[in-house]
Amino acid sequence: MSAVLGRYRTSEAMWERMRPLIPKPVDHHPLGCHRPRVEDRRAMDAILFVLRTGCQWNALNATGICSSSAAHRRFQEWTQAGVFWQMWCAGLMEYDELKGIDWEWLSGDGAMNKAPLAGEKTGPNPTDRAKSGTKRSLLVDGRGAALGLAVSGANVNDFKLLRETIESIPVDRPRPTRQRLQNVCLDKGYDYDEARELLAEFGFTAHIRSRGEEARLLARRARYRARRWVCERTHSWLNRFRGVLIRWCKKPENYVALLHLALTCVNHAVAGLSG
């Protein structure tokens, strides 16, 4: 147990940020006689273990962290209460206070992942022989901190998720001005008039590479790197969390909750915070 907890346990710094967001439990037993409730810290350690390793919930019984039923039940309770979304919001606000969100250059992109159990917001993956898959759409700031998230089936075009991704930004966004434009860098998957009109509607300045344009730039400048590389890096960081690398959750709200927890960890790392 100590070896497992030593590697995957929630750090003290992160737990101190999470603890105020966890709701107090309500005792529904008429006599108050029931088994002792597993500590919130141990339940969070178990959830983080599942997120990092991608193991089945039932495998938690072998780790000694806590029982699989207790961890999964607590995960469902906190998902319904919006705890993981609040953690993501609180992490973004703290990041904004410490470093300031870089609104000048934003980047967006989508990434597809396998979803063997299917469920809502999944679809045939065109890059995986039409097997069941899911797509996550991210909007990040200039340093790679995730500001927006949307989930859909793998067969949905990236630009179709742009509105939902922008509208999911949980923090107050400053108003763009002529002196301080808010630029959004996107790849050729967003090369549609609908995407440009949508960005203009929200006050963003669009920078969308047309089909073939980036290939020509790379041919002339071998070391050329698009500004949106920070978004691709954030997707890569998310894939290190094996619990979201392959979507085993049939319910989309459970998958989104795991993504919010993973993004909380990513944003803390971008902010230079321990844990």
How does the language model describe each region?
Residues 1-275:
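Short alpha-helical elements
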